[in-house]
Amino acid sequence: MEKTFTFRKKNSRNYNIGEAHIKSTYNNIIITLTNKKGDVIAWSSAGKMGFKGSKKNTPYAAQITAEDVAEKGLNAGIKKLKVIVKGPGAGRDAAIRALVNKNLILLVIKDITPIPHNGCRPPKKRRI
């Protein structure tokens, strides 16, 4: 008697609302797309997109990175986003604009950049 195998289709999750965490530092930009619980759906960074050195923290690199994440999010079924921005880098606004241009609806833009209440002493100024 032959055994028959049945293959089940993988359960492809279809999300509607997601969160885009944009971490923009002076050296790089990292964008992570999560669902409401915080499980990672997709991520990308300027270094992953092929930018090297000081080109990683440019608005253009942020735009390309955000477009890559938005494409993956649209494939996962995300239509609406909450954007959480962290850090002082140059590509923050360009990344948000790129997400809007990919026909994603932004619900909230929240800035959670950590600001010290006179915490540690900063490093000395560079003399060039």
UniProtKB/Swiss-Prot annotation:
It holds the Pfam family Ribosomal_S11. The keyword Disulfide bond does not apply. One of its GO terms (biological process) is translation. InterPro entries: Ribosomal_uS11 (IPR001971), Ribosomal_uS11_bac-type (IPR019981), Ribosomal_uS11_sf (IPR036967). Transmembrane segments: none annotated. GO terms for cellular component: ribonucleoprotein complex; ribosome. One of its GO terms (molecular function) is structural constituent of ribosome. Keywords: Ribonucleoprotein, Ribosomal protein, RNA-binding, rRNA-binding. PANTHER family: 40S RIBOSOMAL PROTEIN S14/30S RIBOSOMAL PROTEIN S11 (PTHR11759). Part of the 30S ribosomal subunit. Interacts with proteins S7 and S18. Binds to IF-3. Located on the platform of the 30S subunit, it bridges several disparate RNA helices of the 16S rRNA. Forms part of the Shine-Dalgarno cleft in the 70S ribosome. Belongs to the universal ribosomal protein uS11 family. This is Small ribosomal subunit protein uS11. It comes from Karelsulcia muelleri (strain GWSS) (Sulcia muelleri).
